[in-house]
């Protein structure tokens, strides 16, 4: 999971929400560890000023799935990156397609990116 750029590890729900709200962009998303269910992850998505959280888990056979809207057929993916790619498309059972990955930065240095926007020292937002 550490190889997934949007995975922030064991951050609190509040910290994840602050990171997403700081972007101000609907469709911004990140992955973090669930605080309440060990071994489960949370896919957090910003939409109209609210954070929507979807549980993501890995089956015993290694497949990945997300709990989406009721009535939406549960899909399984071989890799977490495939799950993220699928949810970048509309009508997948989440509030808005995943559009702007909020990546965890490896260095704590603030830089002037190629977009000319100063980046937060802990995250990097990439436009598609």
Curated annotation (Swiss-Prot):
Outcome after substituting residue 16 to D: In XLP1; abolishes interaction with SLAMF1
Region annotation (Interaction with FYN SH3 domain) ranges: 67-92
Cysteines paired by S-S bonds: none
Record note on what altering residue 68 to I does: In XLP1; loss of interaction with CD84; strongly reduced affinity for SLAMF1
Domain of life assignment: Eukaryota
Region of interest: Disordered: 106-128
Outcome after substituting residue 102 to G: In XLP1; reduced protein stability and strongly reduced affinity for SLAMF1, decreases interaction with FYN
Known function: Cytoplasmic adapter regulating receptors of the signaling lymphocytic activation molecule (SLAM) family such as SLAMF1, CD244, LY9, CD84, SLAMF6 and SLAMF7. In SLAM signaling seems to cooperate with SH2D1B/EAT-2. Initially it has been proposed that association with SLAMF1 prevents SLAMF1 binding to inhibitory effectors including INPP5D/SHIP1 and PTPN11/SHP-2. However, by simultaneous interactions, recruits FYN which subsequently phosphorylates and activates SLAMF1. Positively regulates CD244/2B4- and CD84-mediated natural killer (NK) cell functions.
UniProt protein name: SH2 domain-containing protein 1A
Source organism (scientific name): Homo sapiens
